Amino acid sequence: MRWRWRHGAERYEDARVTSNPPLGTRTLGRAGLRVATLGLGCMGMSQGYGAADRDESIATVHRALDLGVTFLDTSDVYGDGHNEELVGEAIAGRRGEVQLATKFSLSRGDAGMVLDGRPENVRACAEASLRRLRVDVIDLYYQHRVDPRVPIEDTVGAMAELVQQGKVRFLGLSEASAASIRRAVAVHPIAALQSEWSLWTRDLEMAGGGAAGEDTVLGVAREHGIGIVPFSPLGRGFLTGAITTPDDFAADDFRRGHPRFTGDAFAANLRLVDAVRGMAEEKGCTPGQLALAWVLAQGDDVVPIPGTKRRAYLEENVGAAALELSAEDLARLAAIAPPGAAEGGRYADAAYAYGDSPERGAR
């Protein structure tokens, strides 16, 4: 089978799974948050991946709801609030169809990103998000990153008060360590853990997210009945096979400075994608669909949230739900992309992956 590129060399056009059967739902957490099997990450509609067309972004959200992709993910830091406003506008009149997730604790300061998990900030951020989203309740409220200065018990305690007040339905953590998860669930049930997980980022499966002598973050989350919400399940677009050179990125695309998209790491990671591409051709799907199907196959407690700001890419992603991977397929993919296979760090040093907080009373 021959592959043909769309204009702009962005996605494969042939051999794409295009049937879109009903997505169904999955459950996050023991408390029973039912969400669509596949979510939509909305960040790129406001930042990170070059310019976005507002009308196309809103149309993408509407198309997502039409296709049953009703689990929408945003954050107060995306576009400094713009993303929440955009999502709020897009879901106006369709709120009943949506499972809405947003996050707090990250903001931009003069010297870079600022973390704030203080209880008073939890409350202030929630009120601001409710206003921007134009809703009365947030279905899933995450701490975006663990604040290393504030005991997580204090942060989650303030989040739990929002549940008691009816402003939030379920609580989540993002990029938290195994130890932080254990401390958080002692305060209030956690429905979901959001973390990067894909064929080229399998740190979640590694001890301590990569540190020796610790439990896996994935194992601890599952021990406590916490659902997994993988972000960047397509490797920030790399696993679609569309990116062949750093010049494919717009000038304001953050991937230009990402460790895995620069220098020797870029060339090494292209070889991984080439192997995925070859298998996808055999399966009659795109590389991105195969990569996304692998994430979906990791368990019924897994709900990936691939991001896009275009309807065409959304529809391609939804097609991944129609793919069935055999045990042999999964074994082949595991051999192609074992944990640690990708070259380069997944974050810059200041990104607070798998964060910890101080013990209460510590100085």
Question: Which residues are covered by each model-predicted region?
Answer:
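N-terminal binding-site loop/beta-alpha segment at the start of enzyme catalytic domains
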Residues: 2-99, 360-363
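Beta/alpha (TIM)-barrel catalytic core signal, keyed to glycine-rich beta->alpha loops juxtaposed to Asp/Glu
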Residues: 8, 22, 146, 150-336, ...
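Conserved beta-strand positions
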Residues: 40-42, 74, 140-143, 173, ...
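A short acidic, helix-capping loop that chelates divalent metal ions and anchors anionic groups
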Residues: 44-49, 107-113, 203-204, 313-316
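Short, acidic/polar
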Residues: 52-64, 117-133, 177-182
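Alpha-helix N-cap and loop-to-helix initiation/capping positions
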Residues: 52-56, 82, 86, 113-124, ...
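Structural motif
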Residues: 63, 67, 132-133, 166, ...
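Active-site groove signature of glycoside hydrolases
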Residues: 130-148
